[in-house]
Amino acid sequence: MCIRDRYYTWNEIIKNDICDAMKAYGHEVKLLSYEIKSYIKDIEFLNIVENELNNGRNCGKPYDFIFSCNFMPVISKIALRNKIPYVSWTYDSPCMTMYSEMIYNPYNFMFHFDSSEVERIRKSGVKHIYHLPLAVNVRRTDAQIRACADNVSPALINKGVAFMGNLYNNEPDFVESVAGLPDYEKGYINGIKLAQLTMPGSELLEEMFDDALCDRLKKYVSFSKEEEFFVKDTDMILNMLKKNISSMERIGILRELSEVCDVTLYTQSSGCDMRGVRVREYIDYERDMPVMFANSAINLNVTLRNIRTGIPLRALDIMGAGGFLLTNYCPELNEYMTEGKDFVSYIDAGDCCEKAVYYIEHEAERKKIAANGHDRILDMFTYEHQIKKMFDVIRKEL
């Protein structure tokens, strides 16, 4: 029996890879691309989806699932109204829609790449929430890399360190954006941010930023939230501060690296000129990114602070392309792979610089680690592997 999926896409970068894996798993996949006006309530979108669901039932080809990347409350409501399972795979953090009361919908089957988020949501009483790391379409990336092996663009070749990502330098600084914030609170928060930078493996920010501090800040700042969202103001402030810290961390590491080796930054961020850092435009995720990772000596990952335990997609992309990964400490990466064998992690900026220089100079060791990382992705983190795990879980629950 053919399983029919209605896949809502917002043109996320992993759309095609997920579709290919679902089809390989024997599913018939029909995409729906639509610009949702509100992730909470969109009558036009609801009517479009429900008409298609009804048409499928009327012609004897009902849909078995609705699917989306990231959890969408408006889709969950459609699933509840039509009593059809809604499968979501969240790969963003923070994903604020996971604070919607619709996470309690019994027709949801929610998968999340970060086990700490799964635990948080499960503790709130949600049953159908599961941990599922992200994936790489290794078949596609390997073919792309082989196809252009003899004709790689110079813009995709790096003999030193390459970093592809957002610097978040255009995000508002929380402390400076709050009008009238007293100097004491400014100094306290800035002190926490600086202390967190010097203690990369800790959760100092969350330990020191308590509800009492948040209550004091409420005198100067307020947040607009949907009624059905139960996110605390403390969590919203923490998410903003974590982005600020991530920006400081990424810029700081790139600056220190530029003093000891060649550094190339691929980014959409504006106003990020740094002495010694070659800045290039963001490159296409499917076409150019795997080729760049495969042709860079060192590929740097600096995880966004909002990700507590999960393996960032970028880290998997690097290893899946056969690139050498140098990353900050990532709990789940260490659960699935071996540090120093499949990838290399650093403790702080100084350690990052030392290891970057070492592995630039020791090509054989670097290539061996990169090859091991690629093999681990092939063994455990392909889309075919993860999609099978996803629907094996769902089959047991239905």
Language model: regions and residue ranges:
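Catalytic binding pocket for nucleotide-activated donors in carbohydrate/polymer assembly enzymes
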Residues: R4-T9, I13-Y25, K30-K37, I103-Y104, ...
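Short N-terminal targeting/anchoring amphipathic segment
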Residues: Y7, E52-F71
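Nucleotide-sugar donor-binding catalytic core of glycosyltransferases
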Residues: Y8-K15, K127-H128, P133-I307, C330-L333
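N-terminal beta-loop-helix "entrance" segment that forms/cooperates
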Residues: K37-L53
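Glycosyltransferases and closely related glycan-assembly transferases
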Residues: R57-P62, V74-Y86
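Structural motif
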Residues: D64-F65, P85, F109, I298, ...
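Active-site proximal beta-strand in glycosyltransferases
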Residues: A79-P94, F109-H112, L134, A162
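A conserved, positively charged/aromatic
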Residues: Y99-F111
